[in-house]
C-alpha cells in the first residue's frame, strides 16, 4: 500500500479512484494531480514506481490542503462564524440548518431525534 498524505491508498485500484480516498481530493483534483504528474489514468497504484508516488506526494503537499489541515481549517471557519455571532454562526451554535432550509417539518438530521412533548397525544 502506498501512503500519501497520511492515508494508506488501496493498491489494486486505479490511481484516479485511489487518490479520492484522501479527504479533500475529489474527482477533479485527482484528475488534475494525475495530469500534472504525467501518469496514465488507467494505471493501478501497484504499477506506480517510487518516483511517481513521490511526485504525487509532492504535488499534493504543494498544491492542496488535505486531511487534518483541511478539517482544522473547516472547523476554524465554523468557530469564527460562531464567535462573530452572525446568523450562520447562531444557526451552527443552535444546531439548526444553516443554509435556509425549513425547520417546521424535516431537518431531523441536523436537529436530532424528535423530543416528546409532555401531555401531547397523537
Curated annotation (Swiss-Prot):
Pfam families referenced in this protein's UniProt entry, alphabetically: Ribosomal_S13
One GO MF term: rRNA binding
Function: Located at the top of the head of the 30S subunit, it contacts several helices of the 16S rRNA. In the 70S ribosome it contacts the 23S rRNA (bridge B1a) and protein L5 of the 50S subunit (bridge B1b), connecting the 2 subunits; these bridges are implicated in subunit movement. Contacts the tRNAs in the A and P-sites.
Entries under InterPro entries matching the protein: Rbsml_uS13_C, Ribosomal_uS13, Ribosomal_uS13-like_H2TH, Ribosomal_uS13_bac-type, Ribosomal_uS13_CS
Subunit field text: Part of the 30S ribosomal subunit. Forms a loose heterodimer with protein S19. Forms two bridges to the 50S subunit in the 70S ribosome.
GO CC term (a single one): small ribosomal subunit
Keywords: Ribonucleoprotein, Ribosomal protein, RNA-binding, rRNA-binding, tRNA-binding
Metal-binding recorded as keyword: no
Organism this protein belongs to: Caulobacter sp. (strain K31)
Name this polypeptide is given: Small ribosomal subunit protein uS13
HAMAP family noted in UniProt: Ribosomal_uS13 (MF_01315)
